[in-house]
Amino acid sequence: RYSTVRNLASPSLNANGPHVSDPRSGEIIESDINWYHNVMKLLRNWYFVQTAAVNPEARGVEFKNEVMGELIRFVSSHEFGHTIGLPHNMGSSSAYPVDSLRSATFTKKYGTAPSIMDYARFNYVAQPGDDGVALMPSDWGTPNVGVYDIYAVKWGYKPILDASEDEEKEILRSWIREKEDDLMFRFGPSGGIDPSSQT
């Protein structure tokens, strides 16, 4: 009945953002962010495994509060995406070429993926010697709401005023056609069917 952010006392290493939709209209009528107590352990493990090869800060037993705060903000933003109806977009993780993910200029502008709804949370491609490359959300501006996310919210929420139902459908289709050849706007569901959905 009420949208909430909840801390759940549980051994689970997870967070999620479920929502309830009106089956007649698709309107989201209630949503939550569930933050399980041990999700910080999961964040620590991800950050260590994905960045420790090039990031001395990730090798410590405990992280600075500022680092953990950035990790929490990033995952909270991902879960918020679910509360407004965005599904996982695992196709986003293959949008950027490896050389771009090793570029400081590129990663500080675009992050690690064009969608926060992917699990490409940290720059696990960076190698020793990739000076200045962005490794985590605060390196490129947190949260990393990507170009795909902005596009998906526009497609799902932008009012199309003074249009008939058929005209509205055509406008929505035209927005899809405009981006269909751009990998930054590619969608890939989670489920392991498409090898380009890498996370």
Describe every region a protein language model picked out.
Residues 22, 36-38, 89, 192-199:
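Poly-acidic low-complexity segments
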Residues 20, 34, 89, 100, ...:
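Residue-level preference for alpha-helix termini and adjacent loops
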Residues 93-199:
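Conserved catalytic/binding loops enriched for acidic/polar residues
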Residues 80-96:
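Catalytic Zn2+-binding segment of zinc metalloproteases
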Residues 39, 43, 91-94, 98:
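Alpha-helix termini
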Residues 1-83, 111-112, 122-125:
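Metzincin-family zinc-dependent endopeptidase catalytic domain
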